[in-house]
UniProtKB/Swiss-Prot annotation:
Substrate binds at residue 142. Signal peptide: none annotated. One of its GO terms (molecular function) is oxidoreductase activity, acting on the CH-OH group of donors, NAD or NADP as acceptor. NAD(+) binds at residues 19, 38, 63-64, 155, 159, 190. Coiled coil: none annotated. This is Uncharacterized oxidoreductase Mb1385. The active site is at 155 (proton acceptor).
Length: 247
């Protein structure tokens, strides 16, 4: 059976760890070449080596809030691997606090990384993809953008905004052969979630009908689906990867 992403080139932001790294691993396993972007260059270089080194994975320092950084990231893929087939806008941060205690800076930081960062990645990737009349853009939203979470007015707003942006961009780009879809993960096992107090973890887990947290690899599988021709007639969709939480 042929690999789903054979000879395709993908750019993944937030690629040094977590979901971004898991997506990179799965993409390479499916035959893709990847360029990982992250603000932590050292960690990104380590991740690229884990994926197989320069022949299949490159590391670039990228602050997604800066359009010039994103442009360099994408152009690295074009120059080193000959094109851009898939863009995964995954970079993210959290600055959780109630509205009473959240600072304006904390709000702005989260909006800038998630929402502006995704906009930068989507528009700059589309500028390259339109030349070939094909491409797949995958944006990382969250269940938090669907239902809202206490202490996450910034994060929930940003993730909901990504849904609206995905749908608007899908309509703008469909005639160019560019598909734009989003993933909305729920409770996914990671260093961040495993650091939660046990009481909070148990509360969140109780909301999941499947009775367990998801694994990063399970989100990566959905990213492969949206990046590949398996989803060739899908654009503007948001796929929940939540184990049934908040259905």
């Amino acid at each position: 059976m042929a690999s789903l992403l054979n000879a395709r080139t993908a750019v993944i932001t937030g690629g040094a760890q977590g979901l971004g790294l898991a997506i990179g691993q799965r993409f390479v396993a499916e035959g893709a070449r990847v360029v990982l972007g992250d603000v932590n260059l050292e960690a990104t270089e380590v991740a690229a080596k884990r994926l197989g080194g320069d022949d299949v994975a490159l590391a670039v320092r990228c602050d997604v809030t800066q359009a010039d950084d994103v442009d360099i990231l994408i152009r690295t893929a074009v120059e080193r691997f000959g094109g851009l087939d898939v863009m995964v806008n995954n970079a993210g941060i959290t600055r959780d606090a109630t509205m009473r205690t959240m600072t304006e800076e904390q709000f702005d930081q989260v909006i800038a990384v998630h929402l502006k960062g995704t906009w930068n990645g989507t528009r700059l990737a589309a500028a390259i993809m339109r030349e070939r009349k094909r491409g797949a853009i995958v944006n990382m939203s969250s269940v938090s953008g669907k239902v809202g979470m206490v202490g996450q007015t910034n994060y929930s707003a940003a993730k909901a905004g990504i849904v609206g942006m995905t749908k608007a961009a899908a309509k703008e780009l469909a005639h160019l052969g560019i598909r734009v879809n989003a993933i909305a993960p729920g409770l996914i096992r990671s260093a961040m979630t495993e650091a939660m107090p046990q009481r909070i973890w148990d509360q969140k887990l109780a909301e999941v009908p499947m009775g367990r947290a998801g694994e990063p690899s399970e989100v990566a599988s959905v990213a492969v689906f949206l990046a590949s021709d398996l989803s060739s007639y899908m654009t503007g969709t948001v796929l929940d990867v939540t184990g049934g939480r908040f259905i």
